């Protein structure tokens, strides 16, 4: 029997007031693949990610994780699905009052009541080493660099050994060298942990490095879906303008308002 895709989005529609953000959106993410969602600000990328996490409910359509619809789930059933997913937030979202070790152990403490404190600490230390960090366990987030915070965030996301990793702008705020190192870590996690990755990003260099497939979200729809090579070579004027970062083309540029 063929396994279902890790993530299936079917005819997903979401509006806020009179603004339709997602319009009849459909795509699948096969197991073990890395899919990058690109698109301009306000195009619905974060809204889409919140639906996958079931932080938002669609107006219509369906979201399936491992073939199971999550739209109607609640309570323990929803918690079980969420344990299959690890989230890496844009700003790392570490707890300032906790050490790095405590941050990584947080999910284990909350969801693995069957584990002793010693076992939880062992797993947390193991995940910290896996993301390439040393001697940060007793440090607080304010005492480490932005790149290290990203790694601690990834360590926390993999602590419960999820099947799916969701990344929200993982290279934002990093210099090119650190951004490349995070991309390499994402690829390492995919290879060693056999996870499926869904990545929201504005960083085209990152998308080209890590993606098996890139989906371009524009005006609430998947405007283009293709491999990194297909995206690079696309004749599509909308996608081409976005990828090249050009100000002239079909995508309007909104000028910043200035004070009188």
Give names to the regions the model predicted.
Residues 53:
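Helix-to-loop junction immediately C-terminal to a conserved catalytic motif
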Residues 68-69, 117-135:
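Conserved ABC ATPase "signature" region
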Residues 165-168:
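Catalytic Walker B motif of ABC-type/P-loop ATPase nucleotide-binding domains
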Residues 140-144, 148:
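Conserved ABC ATPase signature
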Residues 101-109, 121:
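Short helical segment in ABC ATPase nucleotide-binding domains corresponding to the A-loop/adjacent helical element
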Residues 159-163:
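A short, proline-enriched helix->beta-strand linker immediately N-terminal to the Walker B motif
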């Amino acid at each position: 029997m063929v396994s279902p895709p890790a993530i299936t989005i079917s005819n997903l529609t979401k509006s806020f007031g009179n603004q339709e953000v997602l319009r009849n959106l459909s795509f699948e993410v096969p197991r073990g693949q890395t899919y990058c969602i690109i698109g301009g600000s306000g195009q619905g990328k974060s809204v889409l990610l919140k639906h996958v996490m079931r932080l938002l409910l669609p107006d219509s359509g369906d979201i399936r994780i491992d073939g199971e619809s999550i739209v109607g789930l609640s309570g323990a059933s929803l918690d079980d699905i969420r344990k299959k997913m690890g989230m890496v937030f844009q700003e790392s979202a570490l707890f300032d009052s906790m050490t790095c070790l405590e941050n990584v152990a947080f999910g284990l403490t909350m969801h693995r009541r069957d584990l002793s404190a010693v076992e939880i600490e062992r797993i947390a230390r193991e995940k910290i080493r896996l993301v390439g960090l040393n001697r940060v366990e007793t440090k607080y987030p304010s005492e480490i660099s932005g790149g290290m915070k990203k790694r601690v965030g990834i360590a926390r996301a993999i602590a419960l050994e999820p099947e799916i990793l969701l990344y929200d702008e993982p290279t934002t705020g990093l210099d090119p060298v650190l951004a490349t190192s995070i991309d390499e870590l994402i690829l390492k996690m995919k290879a060693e942990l056999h996870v499926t990755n869904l990545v929201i990003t504005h960083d085209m260099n990152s998308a080209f490095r890590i993606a098996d497939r890139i989906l371009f979200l524009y005006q609430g729809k998947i405007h283009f879906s293709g491999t990194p090579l297909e995206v690079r070579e696309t004749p599509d004027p909308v996608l081409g303008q976005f990828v090249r970062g050009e100000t002239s083309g079909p995508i309007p540029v909104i000028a910043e308002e200035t004070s009188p």
